[in-house]
């Protein structure tokens, strides 16, 4: 039976005032609330919330656990949430060992080279001589090139490869928020740039030059014209083209991180990449492939001119575009308002399971039972725990009709949760669970819950 990894402690309210475990299964997410000392009264409507702080408190006799399953509704996150995702995304990059960083950057360079090869062969296959019946206009040739090039970025994003141009934005944001050091930023930039160059060189030689694909006259002439044009710009013009290019690339990365599904990532990435291609902007890694392939094929350009009049200004322009026009602007924009609140709602499964807890350490929890008219009936307070008597994981190939652990019942209830991020970057979650007088039957695509032993200490160590 295939199962997802065990639950892990994900979000904590005010210095561990509420233990919330989270995991994912297909379209479902679930939180686990440990609320000892309380048995759910199914005859009345009530609202429960976790709050308080560590304290010694009398332990009641009947602890229980709520497992809340819900389907997330959000497809694209708001600007502040996307910014925080980028921040976390960048911090993870610094945790890569240098060999893995170089390998992933090498693969990104190969992806760019492969896409550049396909674009060159396809666009170059069309003649531009007006007398040729197969001739196409140069703007059409440029669009053909640009429409295919996003394949490289799709491969990079979906495989987690390291592309230097996107890293200029993410690492600067992390540095601005003091989540990485200047040394970590420099290692990431230099490692990804070196790996990208090696990958582009490998692709140009082994996947383009040695394959003989550049031997076609139309393709070779197209490649030669492209190489000559790229070193014919003035230094300042090439620099500004690099600024524009990486602005588009970093906006594409931003959109990809904000999107929650693969189809959305592909769609939001495609158009900015096509835009920089047809706009004539300069991308340092793409140029590494194109100009190196041109030199191998005999393009009438000198290697020193390539470095001085294209690689250097394009590199600096890409850094400025990614760091200043995107990274610094939005770091400045979102830093003062980093504290935010996000609320969502969903229908959820609730399993009441008890007793499951050790009775030694304690954490204060309060719950309020209310009548449908809002009148407070009873207030519950107390508990905690040191270890779980039975954690739960979701198993594949299961149905809700299957047996559920002892003293557990399943119902479908409205559920709201509120996620808050402080300016220090701490994330907290407040949950609201409304139990109506009459439970709703679970839907047909339910999930089976099976025991998984795990102590509170081992869970807390994963934060």
Swiss-Prot record:
Segments on the Extracellular face: 122-142, 211-237, 287-305
Record-linked InterPro entries: Aquaporin-like (IPR023271), For/NO2_transpt (IPR000292), For/NO2_transpt_CS (IPR024002)
UniProt GO molecular function: high-affinity secondary active nitrite transmembrane transporter activity
Coiled-coil spans in chain: none
Membrane topology, Cytoplasmic segments: 1-100, 164-189, 259-265, 327-463
GO biological process: one example: nitrite transport
Result when mutating residue 166 to S: Reduces lactate transport. Reduces sensitivity to MMV007839 inhibition
Keyword Transferase (UniProt): no
GO cellular component, one term: plasma membrane
Keyword field: Cell membrane, Membrane, Transmembrane, Transmembrane helix
Membrane topology: Multi-pass membrane protein
Positions of the UniProt region annotated as Disordered: 424-463
PROSITE patterns cross-referenced by the UniProt entry: FORMATE_NITRITE_TP_1 (PS01005)
Catalytic activity: (S)-lactate(in) + H(+)(in) = (S)-lactate(out) + H(+)(out); formate(in) + H(+)(in) = formate(out) + H(+)(out); pyruvate(out) + H(+)(out) = pyruvate(in) + H(+)(in); acetate(out) + H(+)(out) = acetate(in) + H(+)(in)
Predominant location category: membrane
Family: Belongs to the FNT transporter (TC 1.A.16) family.
Protein name: Formate-nitrite transporter 2
């Amino acid at each position: 039976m295939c199962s997802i990894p065990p639950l892990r402690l994900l979000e904590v309210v005010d210095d561990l005032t509420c233990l919330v475990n989270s995991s994912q299964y297909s379209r479902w997410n679930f939180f686990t609330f440990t609320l000892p000392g309380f048995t759910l009264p199914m005859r009345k409507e009530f609202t429960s919330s976790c709050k308080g702080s560590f304290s010694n408190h009398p332990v009641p006799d009947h602890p229980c656990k709520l497992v809340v399953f819900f389907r997330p509704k959000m497809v694209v996150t708001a600007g502040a949430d996307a910014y925080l995702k980028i921040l976390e995304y960048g911090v993870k990059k610094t945790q890569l060992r240098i060999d893995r960083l170089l390998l992933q950057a090498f693969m990104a360079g190969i992806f760019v080279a492969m896409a550049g090869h396909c674009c060159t062969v396809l666009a170059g296959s069309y003649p531009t001589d007006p007398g040729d019946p197969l001739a196409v206009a140069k703007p059409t040739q440029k669009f053909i090139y640009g429409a295919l090039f996003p394949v490289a970025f799709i491969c990079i994003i979906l495989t987690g490869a390291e592309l230097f141009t996107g890293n200029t934005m993410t690492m600067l944001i992390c540095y601005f928020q003091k989540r990485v050091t200047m040394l970590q930023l420099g290692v990431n930039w230099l490692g990804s740039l070196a790996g990208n160059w090696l990958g582009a060189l490998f692709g140009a030689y082994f996947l383009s030059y040695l394959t003989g694909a550049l031997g076609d006259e139309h393709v070779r002439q197209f490649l030669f014209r492209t190489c000559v044009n790229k070193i014919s710009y003035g230094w300042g013009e090439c620099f500004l083209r690099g600024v524009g290019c990486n602005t588009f690339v970093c906006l594409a990365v931003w959109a990809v991180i904000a999107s929650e599904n693969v189809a959305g990532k592909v769609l939001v990435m495609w158009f900015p990449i096509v835009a920089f291609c047809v706009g004539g902007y300069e991308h340092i890694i793409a140029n590494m492939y194109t100009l190196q392939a041109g030199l191998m094929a005999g393009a009438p350009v000198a290697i020193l001119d390539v470095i001085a009049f294209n690689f250097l200004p394009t590199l600096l322009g890409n850094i400025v575009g990614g760091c200043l026009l995107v990274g610094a602007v939005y770091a400045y924009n979102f830093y003062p308002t980093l504290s935010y609140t996000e609320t969502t709602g969903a229908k959820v499964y609730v399993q009441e399971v008890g007793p499951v807890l050790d009775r030694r350490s304690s954490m204060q929890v309060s719950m309020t039972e209310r009548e449908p008219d809002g009148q407070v009936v009873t207030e519950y307070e107390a508990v905690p725990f040191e270890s779980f008597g039975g954690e739960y994981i979701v198993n594949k190939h299961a149905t809700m009709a299957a047996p559920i652990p002892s003293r557990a019942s399943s119902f479908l209830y409205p559920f709201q949760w509120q996620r808050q991020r402080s300016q220090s970057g701490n994330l907290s979650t407040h949950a609201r669970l409304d139990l109506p007088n009459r439970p709703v039957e679970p839907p047909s695509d339910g999930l089976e819950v099976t025991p998984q032993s795990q102590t509170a200490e081992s869970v807390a160590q994963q934060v």
